[in-house]
Regions:
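Beta-propeller-forming repeat regions
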Residues: 1-166
Length: 166
């Protein structure tokens, strides 16, 4: 997945990306790419790994928002798992808490439950209490759920919706 968000608070939209693969230069990892001063002439954008080898199981889409109210942008991610996941470590939803230095790896918080086909995960204030909750879908599976901030209690939105992918 790819997403744009201002991760470092400099007013520019950065790119967040994950490969979802267990091999390569950054296995089971996800990163954000810092916008260079002159993007048109830049040969490379600076890469910062926020999920360092702790996003196994064919991770998919990303979301971003300040989930704990500390003023820093946290990142959400899902891993679909399934037959193609040779690690057997997928089928989860999680969020990564940004520290004071967003160029360093973030702290992972795995959300409750096992979720075959986990794909989309977006912060949203579902219950109107002013705190960002998390809405998530099992796009390669069945169902739509939300997690209630701050204890992350899971609530079903629809448990028979097939492949709610995008």
């Amino acid at each position: 997945g790819v997403l744009k968000a201002d991760v470092n608070g400099d007013g520019k939209l950065n790119l967040l990306a994950n490969s979802g693969q267990p091999m390569g230069k950054f296995p089971n990892s996800a990163a954000w790419l810092e916008v260079p001063k002159n993007p048109r002439n830049a040969k490379r954008w600076t890469r910062h790994i926020f999920a360092k080898e702790d996003a196994p199981g064919l991770s998919h889409y990303l979301g971003a928002g300040d989930l704990n109210g500390d003023g820093r942008l946290d990142i959400t991610l899902a891993a679909k798992g399934g037959a193609a996941d040779k690690s057997g470590m997928g089928e989860w939803f999680a969020w990564w808490e940004a520290g004071k230095d967003p160029t360093q790896p973030f702290k992972k918080h795995k959300l409750p439950g096992k979720h075959p086909g986990a794909t989309n995960i977006m912060p949203a204030d579902v219950n109107g209490d002013g705190k960002l909750d998390i809405v998530a879908s099992r796009g390669h599976g069945v169902g739509l759920i939300w997690y209630e901030n701050p204890k992350w209690a899971m609530h079903e939105i629809n448990n028979d919706l097939q492949s709610p992918h995008c």
